[in-house]
Each structure stands twice: as structure tokens, then as C-alpha cells.
Amino acid sequence: MANIDPYRTEEELVEDDEEVDMSFLPPFAKGTENEVLYVENARMERRLERTERALETNMDRLHIMDEHLKNVQQELKYTQTRVEAKNKEIESEKHLNAMAEREMGRLKKDIGKMEAERQELADKINGLQNQIYKNNEKLDQFKMLMNWNQEELEQWALAERQKAEDNAALEKYRHADDGKVKELTLALERVSKQVVGRKEELEAEVVETQAAQIQLDKAAEDFRKLHVERQDLIRQWEEAVEAMRHRDAAIAAASEQFAMQKDVLRERKRELDAQARFLENETLNTKEADARVAYYEREVGKQRDVLAREQARTEELNNQVELVKATLSKAATELAQRTVENKQAREDLDAKRQKLDAARKRFVVLKRKLENEFGNLDSMEAKASELEAMRRGEEARLKAILKEHELLKKEQYKRSQVLFDLRQKERELISEISGGQGQNKNLAARIHALDEQVVARAGGVRSEEETRALNARIEKLTAILEGVKRAEDDLLAARRANTSLRADRAKLDETISTLKLENDMVSRQVKGSVEAREKALVDHDVLALEVKRLRDILAAHADEVFSLENRKQQLALSMEERKQEVEVHRDGLRAELRLLREDVHRITLELKERLLRCEKLQAKFEIISAKHRGSGEDDGEERTQAYYVIKAAQEREALQREGDDLDGRIRVAEKEVAALEATLAQLMAVNTNFAASYKKVGSKEAFEERAALRDKLDKAYDKLKARRADEAAIAGDIQVSEARLSNLGQEQRSLQALVDDMTRRKAEAQRQLDEQREKLGRALGRTDKLRQKLGLANSPQGADVELAEVRDVTRAMLLELKALALANPGAMIAEACEAAGIRLPSGGSNPPSLGGSRPGSARSQTSLGSVRSARSVASQQRGGMGGSPAVRTIQLGA
């Protein structure tokens, strides 16, 4: 008896309570213990089938849950990474806010400092304007005093000669005062130089501070760019996570659909099993089919008798009827042969059934004997080997009997199919016979009409008896003819039926063998598909791991490429900045060249003006300048040719180092690209082999899986194309950088040539300037000799003349500064003059000259001032009499 499982569900209990199909159980086994065993075996098979279905369903669910768990863990990992990125982004934003607040505080301090400086400069400007106003008033008073005629000058000179003794006494005090004034002047010059040095240091510190601020601004801008790039990366990450979530949902839906399809497949398999059972039940109708076959055989025998009688009646017919008889006899012979064959097959079937019954009876006897033997427990060990041998022999016989039983079942199924086809043919034959009878009646009527026409054509008139006799004979012959035709039609129909039955039997045999092969193939395909599915799942997991590893490698390489791109952009920005610096330096050199040319031109004009002035001084010896303080033409420090050569060499070395660095990075990037290509080629080979291994598939799940893998492969190809496009773009950028580097080298060479040309011109101008200085020194020496010879070195007339010349030189210098300020508004000349307390003239009037001298231009007055300055320097070097007034040195903006 079956064991009762307490964990079975109600549905399983209901299925177990269903009636078991007893059609396969032979009649002799009913009501015995074999029937109970058969029922228990059937129920156990049902339970096994249900358990297998439940196990397969649970395995599918377990696999789906494992996949879902992996996806959830991966999504959790991505979410944690996104949270960390968001936290870093928040920290970056806080850092940026703090930097902005610090920068705002610094700007406020700078604004306050600039406001204080502006107030201080405004106070200085007011003081300088007041001082200039007072000096202008004094200058106007002096001009009024100097507006004398020649007679007054002579009287004044006479009075001065009378007061020579008084002046001699005062001269001692003047010498002492001049010494003190010189000391104070030297101290003032030292302090001025210190102030200038402090200002230069301050400007250098300001420049360094501005450079540091620019670097900080650049760093802040780069940080902002990196912040924006990180936000873009986070956004791309979120999009990728969303795409993965959609993909996981699609995979879950596909898994559900796969489970549904498997359920449908199981349902269809269940239906096929039900159809098989129905087919087995249909075999029970074979007996009825055999009875009908016997009935049809009897009918055929009756038809033979009818045919024999009809053959006796149709002896007087033509040779065609003889031929029809021979054909009919041949068909009868074949039909008899077919009947004998069918009878022999039935006898064989009965014999096999008897053998099966005998085998089953022997099986029952042996089983009872085995049970009796099991009852004798004392002799079990002694008879174990004998019983085992008997059991093996009986199992072999049972297998043979079961195999023969299966063959008999198949044969019975074939015969039932043949019987079913014969019934179909019987219905068709009946319908054809009825149709043939109708046609025969129509033909008989037509023959009758034709006979009447023949009689009418003969023209003879028959009597009623003859007519009746002829009609009776015609009717008799017509009936005989109809019988012959019917027999012929029946014979032809029997032949056709026999031929069709043979063809149908052959088709059925072929169909049965085909169905067997298909069943075997389907079972093998199911097993193969299950194994292939398991293998595909394993390969899918391996491929997923490989894809994950390759994805990590690709992400690492993408990060490296991204860092290289950032470095490339930084290099491009630095190259642009360097290019701008070179442009600024080139503009500065051009401006310096232009200034040098202007200086050469100005020096040439000054030389001419000085020559004219020397001639004029020689002609008018009464106008002799006293002492002048020279003003150097170059206020700032000059830079020699070696400075620019060294600077250009340093820049060239820096560019060469940058080029070498770029070449090294390019080589590293090329190696990485080659490694990526090799990895990609290996991945493509693996994908190709994988696709080739799954090229021929037969199931819907395999087709769907292959389509999904093809989609993944297409996406991988798209990513590969994008990476190759990025690589091509990087190569193009590198080529552009190399082209820019070569252009910078060409510009450097052109700037070096320009610097060499400017250095050569500067040397030429310096040589000419030295020559002119020598000539000027000789002229000044001659003038000093004439002045000492005439005794005007320390006289009031000489002082007046010197004062007038100082006034003219000051006016000319102011006009020259104004012209320079108007010509170069970006040089900050006017602001520097205002800062130094010098107010430029508003009008364009020329300085007044002393009696008889023609007015000169600003350029000539400047040259005159330069000559007098040189003379003053020469007089100071010689240690001449009298002190020179202090001249304030100002620094003009570049």
C-alpha cells in the first residue's frame, strides 16, 4: 500500500484520488494484487511527475532570485558610490563658497585700501597744486622784475660792480651754504633712490601678488570646471544606473515570460500524454474494426457469387466483356490473397496475445512463488542466490514480454488506423456506386432512344409482339449490360480501393516511423535543450563576470583617457597663455624698437639743435649758462642684448621640455591604446567564438538569448567605435599641439631675429650717441673756457642768464612730457607727473627766449635742456664754482 505523506497538498490528494486508466491492464490481472500494484505505480508516477515539475519550477525561481539578488547588490553598490559622490560634491560646493567668501573679504580690503590711497593721492595733488600756484606767482613776479631794458641792465651792472666787495664777503658764506646744499642734495638723492628702490620692490611685490592671484583664479576656475565635470559624470552615472534598472526590469520580465513558456510547454506535454492515453484507448476499438472487416469480407463473397452468375449470363457478349472478366478474376485473386494475409495477421496477433497471457500467468505464478519463498524466512539466506538468479531471469523475460507487448500495441494501433481508413473508403465506395447507378440509368435511357432512332432509320415497321419481344430482349440485354457495367465498376472501385488502401498503409507505416523518430528527436532535443540551457546559464554567468571585468578595465582606461584629456586641455591652456605672453613680449619688444627709433631720431635732432645752439652761443657770448644739473636720458635700468638672448634660450628650453613631456605622454597614450586594441581584439575573438557556438539554435528561449547577446555585442561595438573616435580626436589634438609647438618655435626664431636686429641698431645708436657726447663735451669745455675768460662764472649776469635758460629748459621739458603723454596715452605719463607733483602746461606756447634769440620748438628746447644738463654734469665733475639746484627724478609708467 502507498504510504500517506502528511506534507502533500490538497491538490495532490485530489489528483491521487482520480481514477487510474486501467486500459493497459490485461483482463487476467484484474481483481488481483497486480491491479493494486498497477494503481500504486500509476499514482507514484503522477507524484513523481508533479515533484519534478515543482522541482524545476523551484529551481527556476531560485535562479531568478539569485539573479535578482545580484542585481540588487550591484545597484546598492552603485547607490553607495553615488551617495559618496554627492557628499564630495556638497563638500566641494562648501569649499567653493568659503573661497568665494574669502575672496569677497579680500576684495573689500583691497577696495578700502584703494580708497585710502585715492584719498591720500587727492591730498597730495591738492598740496602740489597749491605749491605750483605759489611757484607760478613767484615766477610771474620774477618775470616782471626781469622785464628790464638795456640801460637798466647797464646801471644794474654798474651797481653790481660797486657792490663787488660786499659780494666777496658774502661769497664765503655762499660757499659754505653751497657745501651744505650739496650735502643735503646728495642726501636727498640717496633718499630718492631709496624711495625709487622701495617703489620698484613694491611694484615687484604687486606683480607677484597679481601673478599669484591670477594663478589662484586659474586654480579656482579649474576647480569649478572639475566640479562641473564631476556633476556631468554623476549625471551620466545616474543615467547608466537608470538604464541598468530598466535592463533588470526587462530581464525580470523575460524571466517571467520564460517561466510562463515553460509552464505552457509542460501543459502541452501533459496534453500530449493525454492524447497518447486517448490513442491507447482507441486501440480497444480494434475488435469492432475486425468484426466490420469480416462483414465486408462476407459482402465481398456475395459479390463474387453475383459476379459468377453475371459471368454466365455475359458469355455471349463481345471480347471486351471477356477482357473485363479476366481483369475481374485477377482482382478477385488479389483480394483473396489480401484476405489470407489479413487472416494470417489476425492469427499472429492472437498467438502473440496468447503468448502475452501465458507470460503474464507465468509472471503471476512466479510472483506468488516468490511471495511464498519470502514467507520462508529461515531459508532466505540459503536461497538468496537462487532467487536472485530467478529474479534476473524473470526480469529479462518480463522485459522481453513488455517489449513484445509494446510491439503488439503498436501493431494494434496500425491495424486500427487501417480499419479507420477502410471505413472511410467504404463510405466513398458507397457514394461512388450510387452515382454510377444513376449514370447507368441515364445511359440506358439514352440507349433506348438511340435504338428507336436506329429502327426509325431502318424504315421497317415492327409488330407489337416483335416490338415487345425486342423490347424485352433489349431490356434483358440492358439489364445484363447494366450488371456487367456495375460489376466492372465494382471491380475498378475494388482495385482502386485496394490500391489506395495499400498506399494508405504505406503512408501510415511511414507516418508512424516518422512520428517515432520525431518523438525520439523531441525527447533528445528536450534533453539537449535542458543541458544547453544549463550550459548557457553557466556561460552567461561566466560571460557576465568577463564583461564586468572588461567593464572595470574599460572604466579604468576611460579614467586614464579622461585624465590625459584634462592634461591635454591644461597643456593647451598653458600653451595659449604662453602664446599670449610671447605676444605681449613681442609687443613690448616692438614698442621698445619703436622707442629706440624715436630716440635715434630725437638724438639726431638734438644733435643738430645742439650744434646750432653751440654756434649761437659762440656768436652771443653774453648769454652763458651757469650750472645745470643733468638729467639722465634713461631713468630705468637698461637691459642688454645678453639678457634677451638668455631669456629666449630659457623660453626655448622650456618649450623643448614641454614638447619632450608631450612626446612622452603621447608614447604612453599610444602604448595604452595598443593595449586596449589588443584587449578589444581578444574580446572580439571571444565574442565571435561565443556567437559561432550558438549560431544554430532551435528553441524560442535560445533565439531570445541569442538576440540579447547580439544586442550586447552591438552595444560593445558602438562603444568601441566611440573609443576609436575619441582616440582619433586625441591624435588630432596631439597633432594640433605639435603644430602649435612648431609655430611657437618659428615665432621664437623670428623674435630672436628681431631682438638681434634691435640689439644691432641699439649698438649703432649708442655709438653715435657716444660720438655726439664727445663732441658735446668738447663744445662745453670750450664754452666754459670762454665763460671763465669773460669772468661771467659767478657774476649776477651769469646767474640771470642761467636762470632764464633753466626756465626755458623746464618749459621745454614740460612740453615734451605733454607731447609724450598725448602720443602714448597708455603709458601713464600724466598720472606719474601728477603723482610726482608736476603739472603739465595746458597751452602750446613756446618758452620765451632772451633778448634777440629766436623762439625754438619744444624739440629744440628739449635738446637745449639736454645740452645744459650735460654741461651741468660736466661742471659738477670738474668741481666748478657754485651749487646746482636739485632736480627731482620721476618714474614714468611703462
UniProtKB/Swiss-Prot annotation:
Coiled coil listed as a keyword: yes
Intracellular or extracellular location(s): Cell projection, Cilium, Flagellum
Signal sequence extent: none
Family: Belongs to the CCDC39 family.
Keyword Cell membrane set for record: no
Keywords: Cell projection, Cilium, Cilium biogenesis/degradation, Coiled coil, Flagellum, Phosphoprotein
Self-association state and partner proteins as the record states: Interacts with CCDC40/FAP172.
GO cellular component: axoneme; motile cilium
Inactivation phenotype: Short and immotile flagella. Inner dynein arm (IDA) and nexin-dynein regulatory complex (N-DRC) components are absent or severely reduced. Radial spokes are attached to doublet microtubules with an irregular periodicity of 32 nm instead of 96 nm.
Coiled coil: 32-143, 187-411, 461-609, 647-788
Lineage of origin: Eukaryota, Viridiplantae, Chlorophyta, core chlorophytes, Chlorophyceae
Domain of life: Eukaryota
Biased composition (Low complexity): 844-857
Biological processes, Gene Ontology terms: cilium movement; inner dynein arm assembly
Region of interest: Disordered: 844-894
Gene: CCDC39
Membrane-spanning residues: none
Protein name listed in UniProt: Coiled-coil domain-containing protein 39
Pfam family, any one: CCDC39
Described function: Required for assembly of dynein regulatory complex (DRC) and inner dynein arm complexes, which are responsible for ciliary beat regulation, by acting as a molecular ruler that determines the 96 nanometer (nm) repeat length and arrangements of components in cilia and flagella. Together with CCDC40/FAP172 forms a 96-nm-long complex in flagella.
Post-translational modification: Phosphorylated in flagella.
